[in-house]
């Protein structure tokens, strides 16, 4: 959990200003359609105002700018004066308040929209801003979530206020392609735009932040039933692309429509040939969705009190908790391979890792003095006042406790993997409990290691900083897995290779075995491995 008090003033106002060369490029594309009215919903100190001047200001253009902070609004106004912008209006205040009034009247006002909307998490917005953000979704009849970010309603309302055939060019977070809270935005863009192009850099454009950013170029449909060309993603390195006419880049980028526009956009980074190969593989009758062959459930929940409920052997011994201590794992350091057995459990204990989950299922009055002392220690630390703890009785008895033969870590760095839970250890809320419904545990664990599952995980998952991929149960259920009965898997060898950091070798090896059995060539297997690697690299850039 991140708290507002811990955030910098820059993060709280979302103030990451666009480099001038990028603003010039985006503005050139919007201006090339000769707009008469332009919206800048969050102008900051006027970088995009300067970009209009740098591209040759047309005195007939009416410029409507909004800025929440008075010091920045003053700077933007000064830029207008220096560049002799006679038709520019700088409004100090919340853009969303004004936008919602216009949306209420169903007005389409602008020929173009520019900018870099604020990057502020919903939880850090003031209450009135939160209300205005939610109102944008309601006006557009879109699903709202409190996991959203300020840039999403800014982009939505700007697009809604754009006239048919209008252009919008903005610098926004790279998470637009994949985060669940932007799904309503992706769907809306796909519905109202004739074409969408994302320029995705390999570098971080904003200093002092790990926030990846992209350029969004989108053209609104001339009429509602116009066919959409979909979304296309262009990967760029450095700033050489700025030498190219943005219209050429936009026109030459192939869009992929249909499911790509409606779902996550990561798929748009793939070529037509790559998409066709993936579709051909998943069309095979032995390639099935995970939800059709297994069940996945979240691990037991401790309400963030992991340091209390998950303990090392020393704590168990000190408070005589042996009767209530059960084996557990929940992080990659607990299980670096695909097998969690007694040997791995002992290794973890010897390292001093918290390998014991405390399930105290007796009433307090019947417990020994030492166990009571441990519970009192938890109350001194006020664990019993935490929401999930205080609503259960007794507070120290964790609900939903059971183990399965298969586990899966919530987050991974290289590729997702299932874990054969041979000691039936419990898992934390950082891991999932998995049960096979159609095949053996060993076959499911080993079959999960293949390039098509890696690819669909990269397409479905959520990217985080530091090169981390996260999958939630609803996304895991969508993964494709190749299930063939009768294959001989050397699970012990695979486990050792993965522990040795050779997971790509395992993916290639397992893909060769399973895909070969299904009639696919070694060349096709290698191509799928390459696709998985390229998606991992793309995801890593987005993650950092």
Swiss-Prot record:
Q: Name one GO molecular function term.
A: site-specific DNA-methyltransferase (adenine-specific) activity
Please name the InterPro entries in this protein's record. DNA_methylase_A-5, DNA_methylase_N6_adenine_CS, M_Eco57I_C, N4_N6_ade-DNA_methylase, SAM-dependent_MTases_sf
> Per the UniProt record, which EC number(s) apply here?
2.1.1.72
Q: Kind of enzyme, top EC level? A: transferase
Q: Quick one: a GO biological-process term for this protein?
A: methylation
Query: Does the keyword Transferase belong to this entry?
Result: yes
Q: Name one Pfam family in it.
A: N6_Mtase
The catalytic activity, as recorded, is: a 2'-deoxyadenosine in DNA + S-adenosyl-L-methionine = an N(6)-methyl-2'-deoxyadenosine in DNA + S-adenosyl-L-homocysteine + H(+)
Q: How is its activity regulated?
A: Stimulated by Ca(2+) and Mg(2+).
Q: Which UniProt keywords apply?
A: Methyltransferase, Restriction system, S-adenosyl-L-methionine, Transferase
Q: What does this protein do?
A: A gamma subtype methylase that recognizes the (non-palindromic) double-stranded sequence 5'-CTGAAG-3', methylates A-5 on both strands, and protects the DNA from cleavage by the RM.Eco57I endonuclease.
Similarity remark = Belongs to the N(4)/N(6)-methyltransferase family.
Q: What is this protein called?
A: Type II methyltransferase M.Eco57I
Protein's organism = Escherichia coli
Q: What is the lineage of its organism?
A: Bacteria, Pseudomonadati, Pseudomonadota, Gammaproteobacteria, Enterobacterales
Point out the gene that encodes the protein.
eco57IBM
């Amino acid at each position: 959990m991140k708290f507002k008090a811990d955030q910098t003033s820059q993060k709280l106002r979302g103030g990451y200003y666009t480099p001038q060369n990028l603003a010039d490029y985006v503005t050139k594309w919007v201006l090339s359609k000769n707009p008469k009215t332009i919206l800048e919903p969050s102008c900051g100190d006027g970088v995009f105002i300067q970009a209009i001047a740098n591209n040759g200001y047309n005195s007939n253009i009416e410029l409507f700018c909004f800025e929440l902070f008075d010091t920045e609004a003053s700077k933007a106004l000064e830029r207008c004066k220096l560049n002799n912008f006679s038709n520019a209006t700088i409004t100090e205040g919340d853009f969303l308040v004004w936008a919602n009034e216009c949306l209420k009247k169903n007005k389409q006002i602008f020929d173009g929209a520019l900018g870099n909307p604020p990057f502020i998490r919903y939880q850090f917005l003031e209450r009135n801003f939160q209300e205005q953000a939610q109102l944008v979704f309601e006006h557009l009849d879109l699903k709202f979530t409190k996991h959203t970010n300020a840039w999403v309603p800014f982009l939505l309302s700007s697009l809604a206020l754009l006239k048919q055939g209008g252009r919008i060019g903005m610098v926004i977070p790279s998470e637009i392609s994949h985060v669940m809270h932007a799904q309503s935005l992706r769907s809306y863009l796909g519905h109202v735009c004739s074409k969408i192009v994302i320029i995705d850099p390999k570098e971080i454009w904003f200093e002092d932040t790990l926030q990846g950013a992209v350029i969004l170029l989108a053209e609104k449909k001339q009429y509602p039933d116009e066919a959409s060309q979909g979304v296309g993603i262009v990967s760029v390195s450095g700033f050489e692309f700025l030498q190219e006419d943005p219209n050429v880049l936009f026109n030459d980028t192939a869009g992929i429509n249909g499911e790509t526009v409606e779902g996550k956009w990561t798929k748009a980074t793939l070529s037509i040939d790559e998409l066709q190969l993936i579709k051909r593989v998943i069309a095979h009758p032995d390639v099935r969705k995970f939800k059709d062959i297994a069940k996945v459930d979240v691990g037991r929940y401790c309400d963030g009190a992991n340091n209390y409920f998950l303990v090392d052997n020393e704590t168990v011994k000190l408070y005589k908790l042996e009767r209530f201590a059960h084996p557990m794992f929940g992080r990659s350091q607990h299980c670096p391979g695909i097998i969690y057995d007694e040997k791995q459990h002992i290794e973890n204990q010897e390292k001093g890792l918290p390998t014991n989950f405390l399930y105290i299922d007796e009433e307090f009055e019947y417990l020994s003095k030492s166990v009571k002392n441990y519970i009192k220690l938890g109350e001194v630390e006020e664990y019993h006042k935490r929401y999930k703890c205080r609503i259960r009785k007794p507070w120290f008895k964790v609900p939903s406790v059971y183990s399965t033969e298969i586990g899966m870590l919530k987050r991974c760095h290289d590729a997702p993997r299932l874990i054969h839970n041979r000691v039936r250890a419990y898992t934390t809320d950082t891991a999932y409990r998995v049960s096979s419904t159609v095949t053996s545990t060993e076959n499911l664990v080993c079959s999960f290691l293949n390039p098509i599952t890696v690819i669909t995980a990269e397409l479905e998952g959520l990217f985080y900083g530091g090169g981390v991929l996260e999958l939630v149960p609803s996304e895991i259920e969508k993964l494709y897995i190749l299930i063939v009965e009768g294959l001989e898997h050397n699970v012990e060898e695979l486990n050792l290779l993965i522990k040795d950091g050779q997971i790509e070798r395992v993916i290639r090896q397992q893909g060769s075995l399973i895909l070969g059995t299904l009639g696919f060539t070694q060349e096709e297997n290698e191509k799928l491995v390459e696709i998985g690697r390229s998606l991992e690299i793309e995801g890593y850039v987005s993650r950092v």
